[in-house]
């Protein structure tokens, strides 16, 4: 699995477009805080902005890396991300995608990110900080069983929310 940082074409206002050939410009404001999936964007960029940004594809895993850092999302769309995101490529090579989502959503991993992100003016994550997080990696079959149990508990809790 590879981790890459997003990038922004500058000045961004020169790249924003309403044209039908525009590329989804995925921003942190496009996602719900407690959401799981990225399904649409409010803005698009011109195709010329692709080479100055980072393309993401359906199934890529996105992680916020600044300000409200450490929030995971699964992209359901093609688009480009700015430097406030990290993209985790090909996570399904080693992870059940839902297991990775719950792992990255856990207090266990978030607390590691808090420690790693502190020390600068603005708390943020980078590729090295995310890559150095300590995780337990059970076999894929066991990951799927864990996900099934988590989702069973979530279904029991949801009526009370």
Q: Model-found features: residue ranges?
A:
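Non-catalytic DNA-recognition/assembly elements of restriction-modification systems
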Residues: 1-9, 132, 136-161
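Sequence-specific dsDNA recognition surfaces
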Residues: 1-15, 29-58
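A short beta-sheet element
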Residues: 27-28, 44-105
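A short glycine-rich beta-alpha junction/loop motif
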Residues: 65, 79-86, 98, 118-140
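Periplasmic-binding protein-like
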Residues: 109-112
């Amino acid at each position: 699995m590879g981790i890459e940082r997003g990038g922004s074409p500058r000045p961004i206002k020169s790249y924003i477009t309403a044209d039908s050939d525009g590329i989804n410009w995925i921003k942190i404001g496009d996602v719900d805080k407690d959401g799981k999936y990225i399904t649409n964007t409010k803005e698009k960029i011109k195709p010329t902005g692709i080479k100055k940004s980072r393309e993401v594809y359906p199934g890529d895993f996105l992680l916020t890396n600044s300000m409200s850092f450490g929030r995971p999302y699964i992209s359901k769309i093609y688009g480009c991300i700015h430097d406030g995101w990290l993209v985790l490529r090909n996570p399904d090579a080693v992870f059940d995608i839902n297991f990775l989502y719950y792992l990255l959503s856990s207090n266990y991993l978030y607390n590691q990110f808090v420690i790693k992100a502190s020390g600068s003016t603005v708390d943020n994550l980078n590729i090295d900080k995310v890559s150095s997080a300590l995780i337990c990696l059970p076999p894929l079959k066991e990951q799927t069983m864990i996900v099934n149990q988590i989702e069973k508990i979530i279904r029991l809790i949801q009526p009370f929310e």
